Amino acid sequence: GVRLVGSEMCIRDRYIPYAGELGLLLPLGISFYTFQSMGYVMDVYREIVEPEKNFLKVALFVSFFPQIIQGPIAIYDKLAGQLYEGHSLRLENLQKGALLVLWGVMKKLVIADRAVNIINFVMDKPMDFSGTYVFFAAVVYALQLYADFSGGIDIVRGIAEMFGITMSTNFNHPYFSRSLTEYWHRWHMTLGDWCRNYIFYPLSISKRFLNFGKWLKPRFGAHISKVLPGCIASVITFIVIGVWHGANMKYLYFGLWNGIVIMLAELFAPVNKKVAGGFFKLTGLREKGIFATIVSVLWTFMLILVGYYFDIAANASTAFHMLFKSVTDFHISELGINNIILNLGACGLDEYDILLLIICTLLWFFISFVEENKKLDMRDFILSRKLPLRWAIIYLGIFIVIIFGYYGPGVNPADFVYMQF
């Protein structure tokens, strides 16, 4: 698995930057296309699935049109059967699929394409801004990336659903996670599943890693011997995930940061549990109460944000300087709405755009919060309303896109972020 991924990344990063100069035609979404192909080949090799003898059926699985540009990455035995059987057009599928497409378009055009102006403006010369605005740009990037990527996936899944095809969920409200491990089970879930199945598990249960665990037990105890081999496999997996994003040291640091933080959390889990237990006993707070949840979610978001500094910066050195500046030159008073408009007004957004961005983001997270806590599918909720209210909500969504979408003359449309992979 690791060798195949390495080969794909080598080809992509070595030759794709020069594709235009060489006059080469390259397939859209080469990484997603390659990952699905590799997954199928490895499943056949492991005898998890039967080899498909019909080349056209395999080609359909690999190149199913909605997903090929930016995923989600499908597992053969979960998707292939749906593609090979007949589907009749059903009103329920058309309605639910169209609602998901509309929701994705709203996130992309109203939030992501507007927010990217702030990010580009600050990241063009990040050292010219105070640490406050570097941090603010990183927060905006976290929101923009989520809106852009999840919006694109919603459009893909919605189109497939209209044809009666159910594709894997790729996001599950990741910014409500209480730990970095939980975040990676909620973010880009199909990539996470792929890496666990074809990189992490083969490494962690390999003979070398199992023998390493046996060697550790008499020297460092049961906990370390049980956890450390898996932690090392996890770090290697995150390095692969990081480098998959590009042949740049900043992506290596991105992978290392996530892998090492998760490794430390696992290694020190018993200590953390005792400390947390003592704190809750002393204060009388509940471990899963509102206060503990808010603190855990905010702390996790800050850990996520540190990783994003390496993603957003031009290079690793700039990322470290940005992190240092965010800590040493941060002034909360600069985050007032008037100061934001004054300092970031040249990014191409006016006061109306910034206020609209804030309001729409808050509305988006309110809906996500309701879905998360009530275990509610908003599409089912809308379609269960009486006809007048149902269509009022749908038309409201359409009008929001038409009126508040960031497009038109003078606007440079932003590609989906993950199209570059």
Task: Annotate each predicted stretch with a short phrase.
Residues 2-4:
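A short, hydrophobic C-terminal helix/tail in secreted or cell-surface proteins
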